[in-house]
């Protein structure tokens, strides 16, 4: 069973990715706040370089992997969406060739 991350793990991940991802804004909706009677905050990850939050995880994983195991020869992933875009972008930042496979639908 995996262990839960500690705050120091979150800080380390932030340090690994901060130069490679966009610092996206937190926004709110006055209409939704009024309807719910509470303040609701949204993290606008749609403004990220690849259009989703997945870039944060892909960048963190690849940087951590490279720090602990060295640069891989190639990255192979299976995805047809945001994960594929994130892996491809993160791989290109590190000059690692990336092969993305996607199923036909």
Segments predicted by a language model, with ranges:
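PLP-dependent amino-acid enzyme catalytic core
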Residues: 1-105
